[in-house]
Design a protein with these regions (language model features):
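Membrane-interface, cytosolic juxtamembrane amphipathic helix immediately N-terminal to a transmembrane helix
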Residues: 1-16, 139-167, 232
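N-terminal low-structure segments adjacent to metalloprotease catalytic domains
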Residues: 1-55
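Metalloprotease/metallohydrolase-associated module, dominated by Zn2+-dependent proteases
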Residues: 2-3, 15, 180-251
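Juxtamembrane "helix exit" motif at the C-terminal ends of alpha-helical transmembrane segments
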Residues: 25-40, 170-195
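Transmembrane alpha-helices and immediately adjacent membrane-cytoplasm interface residues
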Residues: 44-70, 213-225
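Peri-catalytic and regulatory segments of divalent metal-dependent proteins
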Residues: 57-148, 152-156
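Active-site-proximal gating segments in proteases and membrane effectors
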Residues: 98-122, 221-231, 235, 240-293
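Post-HEXXH active-site segment of zinc metalloproteases
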Residues: 155-185, 250-259
Length: 293
């Protein structure tokens, strides 16, 4: 039964965009490197390379690397540990009662920034900023409940999985770019040696077209991934609500961690988080007793 609960949390509508993102990129690689059909001999090296990158990204090494890139460090100050760790333990125990299949422990790291913020990384890491310490205990617990929701639904682990896939896909896109540069170089040499206008023209056209196509493909695929990330914010908010932190989380989102995508349709489509008003409204629809006015 536990495995079905785990699969149920992963295969949700909110993760549909992530799945489409993954399938589109894998489909592109297979189309480029297996143009005459997918055979075991052709696909096996690709699968092995992909599995290796995914295993590395899902390992503690991948989690540690992502935390390091985010600037997250181990908490050394005793006063910060005394303040935060008991609050996280309370929320974590509540989450374990609701989701017994969760990891057995959570690591807490800190980022030295003054704006209040927190985010989950991998399977068991939550990062907080210095600014979060300015919130009340109840508000910090509400933020923890949201981040624990990401861990419970394995959103951050899926992001690591996608990160490994991106590393794999980026390598192949780099190969494509190198091939394009080589072809451009050939056109350039032909144009120089023959003093041909058309050689230079085709070189410029091919280089520009290949760059634009790769950029468009990347942006198109990212639309689906960003959609999933925004939907998963609602899912984590709902998890916090079910743990009893709905009204407090709505207050934090409204007063301390207000976020709004930049103006414009495209910027909104590529935003990682929904507008704070939308998140507060969703919590109110769930039953959170919160009103700012």
């Amino acid at each position: 039964m536990d495995i079905w609960h785990r699969l149920g949390r992963i295969f949700r509508i909110s993760n549909l965009g992530t799945l489409i993102f993954f399938l589109l990129n894998i489909g592109l690689i297979l189309a480029l490197f297996c143009p005459y059909g997918v055979t075991f001999e052709a696909a096996a090296p690709l699968v092995v390379c992909y599995i290796v990158t995914v295993l590395i990204s899902l390992s503690p090494i991948g989690e540690w690397t992502l935390a390091a890139l985010a600037g997250a460090k181990e908490i050394k100050r005793k006063d910060i540990k005394i303040r935060l760790i008991p609050l996280l333990e309370i929320v974590f125990e509540q989450a374990k009662e609701r989701t017994p299949s969760m990891v057995n422990s959570i690591r807490l790291k800190i980022i030295h920034e003054q704006s209040p913020n927190a985010f989950a990384i991998g399977r068991r890491t939550i990062c907080v900023t210095d600014g979060l310490l300015n919130l009340s205990d109840e508000e910090i617990m509400a933020v923890f409940a949201h981040e624990v929701g990401h861990l419970a639904y394995q959103h951050s682990a899926i992001q690591l999985l996608i990160g490994g896939g991106n590393l794999f896909i980026s390598g192949f896109l780099l190969i494509i770019k190198v091939v394009c540069w080589m072809i451009m170089g050939i056109f350039a040499l032909v144009g120089i040696s023959t003093r041909s206008f058309w050689g230079g023209f085709f070189m410029t056209l091919f280089g520009s077209l290949s760059t634009v196509l790769i950029w468009l493909w990347t942006k198109f695929c990212m639309l689906f991934l960003m959609w999933s990330m925004r939907q998963n914010e609602f899912v984590a908010d709902e998890y916090a609500y079910k743990l009893g932190y709905g009204a407090i989380l709505a207050s934090v989102l409204d007063r301390h961690m207000c976020s709004a995508p930049s103006n414009g349709l495209l910027k909104a489509l590529y935003a990682t988080h929904p507008h704070s008003d939308d998140r507060v409204a969703r919590l109110q629809e769930l039953g959170a007793n919160y009103s700012r006015y």
